[in-house]
């Protein structure tokens, strides 16, 4: 029997809470509770990083230097060690993680750290067909000051598969939610787009969803077979700044982007 998909929510001073997928998706009548906006101005800072299960030194230093000022931190391969949970609950109002698979002590998966509570939370998992392990994704939504709702997708795509059937299957339920969402969207993470088939499928998905890709002038993203693995796509906002941090704290370099939520044109 397949294990139930859920997210674990971490909030300072409270026990961890298990969050199951909502009964109604965001676009078909999910009730949104009133919440404090994610930002109070027009700029939204986002950090995206495959943190390699915190296996290398200096990962905490990178988060402390670059993550604590971001409104959203989208981590992949985040292992819920006491150190990471402490950082998340100290600098952020809430952290939601979707366990993809359980390691000896702490589960690993995508984790979204946010400066405001999500009004919607939909955890997703897809099983790797060859290794029989899972990759996870998380769809969350946050109110913005302009009365719009921002949809955020944090994804770690399946890696080892023959062809792109499972790869496309993982994007399917995400696309169903994005295409019906009326407000701005961010989808980011480790897409494992290391083949021509995969990158073509990813770009086709982005076109169908009306998404634009964040471009980096000095592109130091982790590559496999000459193709980048990490991406940020967006809709309904403009890009003010975008950069890739070079570090040895993981086998991936973090992506930093600052959006202007009041414009749909890129400023850089």
Swiss-Prot record:
InterPro entries: Endo/exonu/phosph_ase_sf, Endo/exonuclease/phosphatase, UPF0294
Localization annotation: Cytoplasm
Entry annotated with the keyword Hydrolase: no
Family matches, as SUPFAM superfamilies: DNase I-like (SSF56219)
A GO term for molecular function: catalytic activity
UniProtKB keywords: Cytoplasm
GO CC annotation: cytoplasm
Record flagged with keyword Cytoplasm: yes
Superkingdom field: Bacteria
Recorded family membership: Belongs to the UPF0294 family.
NCBIfam families per record: PRK05421.1-1, PRK05421.1-2, PRK05421.1-3, PRK05421.1-4
Stated name of the protein: UPF0294 protein ETA_26410
């Amino acid at each position: 029997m397949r294990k139930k998909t859920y997210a674990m929510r971490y909030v300072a001073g409270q026990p961890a809470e298990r969050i199951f997928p909502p009964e109604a998706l965001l676009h078909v009548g999910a009730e949104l509770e009133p919440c404090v906006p994610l930002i109070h101005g027009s700029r939204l800072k986002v950090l995206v990083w495959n943190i390699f299960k915190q296996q290398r030194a200096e990962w905490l230093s990178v988060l402390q230097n670059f993550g604590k000022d971001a409104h959203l931190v989208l981590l992949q391969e985040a292992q819920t060690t006491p150190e990471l949970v402490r950082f998340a609950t100290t600098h952020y109002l809430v952290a939601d993680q979707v366990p993809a698979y359980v390691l000896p002590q702490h589960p690993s998966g995508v984790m979204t750290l946010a400066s405001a509570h999500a009004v919607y939370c939909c955890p997703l998992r897809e099983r790797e067909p060859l290794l029989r392990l899972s990759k996870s994704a998380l769809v969350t939504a946050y109110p913005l000051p302009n009365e719009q709702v921002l949809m955020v997708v944090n994804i770690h795509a399946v890696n080892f598969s023959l062809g792109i059937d499972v790869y496309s299957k993982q994007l399917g339920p995400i696309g169903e939610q994005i295409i019906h969402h009326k407000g701005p969207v961010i989808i980011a993470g480790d897409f494992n787009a290391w083949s021509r088939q995969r990158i073509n499928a990813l770009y086709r998905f982005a076109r169908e969803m009306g998404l634009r890709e964040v471009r980096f002038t000095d592109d130091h993203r982790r590559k496999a077979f000459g193709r980048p693995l990490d991406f940020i796509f967006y809709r309904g906002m403009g890009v003010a700044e975008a950069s890739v941090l070079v570090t040895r704290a993981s086998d991936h370099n973090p992506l930093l982007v600052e959006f202007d939520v009041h414009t749909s044109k890129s400023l850089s």
